[in-house]
């Protein structure tokens, strides 16, 4: 695959990670900068690009509101600051995007929400629904409960996981550096900027350093970990200096960044991931369902004739035809017990059978490899 440097303005789905040092300074929220960023977000949406924002800053804002001292905080202090700051952060984004007629939603997640299969499917479905409704999700770590994330500052990696979860083709990490260098440019005058990284080698990983800012906790090492996750999921990732006003416009107009290139597209990477999973059960379907799967449609309960194995929601299963031939593999949206109960029934009968509303498809086409 030829290495083609991505163009930010051509993204179909863009995830933008905003570091604390960009959003918050000693005086509080950088309101003018945030308004300019949201101007860029509105312009991107007008071009037809879905946008998801992964924003740090809740703890930094909360500690200012609470008057907590400078320096490291105890875990319970960080959690308290996050609880206060999350409200302020969500309101700030809502107010900055409202003049553009853009609705926002707050999603508080942890890395577990994107790595556990059941929670992954729920997160993906929620995000897809929000984006389909024209909403800009504002994602942050749930720092009020996620003590490990507070200690290690994983918002860079969280952004990469979110990008993979929602099938983004581009991830932009806005930070206080303009990309990856061969050494720390603030201490080594011979350091060279790398505009494109085609493969994350041990030599590239060795270029990671420690955080420079006193506000942001994410250093280059976490950004390289994020890049590895993103490109494995088919998502191109860029590291850009974001302190300027209208940072997305600046990147689109050629500002210096480092792009990390994937070797596949998001959908192909996702299909490969699903195909590699060991199935926990089998679902046998009739001829009509088999034909529908061949046409790229989702698997509905009505076409299911048998369910074997024991599996939970989000687990991988294999789909077989009436003769035992393999048709597809995918992530199932119901447990084996639920699947047996609704097998052969129409989707509009699910609530009456299970006692609660469910999803129309047993396996959605986006979660299936035929």
From Swiss-Prot:
Catalytic function, reaction form: L-glutamate + ATP = L-glutamyl 5-phosphate + ADP
Pathway: Amino-acid biosynthesis; L-proline biosynthesis; L-glutamate 5-semialdehyde from L-glutamate: step 1/2
Domain of life assignment: Bacteria
GO cellular component labels: cytosol
Residues in PUA domain copies: 280-357
Main location: cytoplasm
Pfam families: AA_kinase (PF00696), PUA (PF01472)
Gene Ontology BP terms: L-proline biosynthetic process
UniProt entry keywords in alphabetical sequence: Amino-acid biosynthesis, ATP-binding, Cytoplasm, Kinase, Nucleotide-binding, Proline biosynthesis, Transferase
Amino acids binding ATP: 17, 175-176
Protein EC: 2.7.2.11
Gene Ontology molecular-function annotations: ATP binding; glutamate 5-kinase activity; RNA binding
Subcellular location: Cytoplasm
Binding site for substrate: 56, 143, 155
Stated role: Catalyzes the transfer of a phosphate group to glutamate to form L-glutamate 5-phosphate.
Family to which this protein belongs: Belongs to the glutamate 5-kinase family.
Name of the featured protein: Glutamate 5-kinase
Species in which this protein is naturally found: Paracoccus denitrificans (strain Pd 1222)
This protein's encoding gene: proB
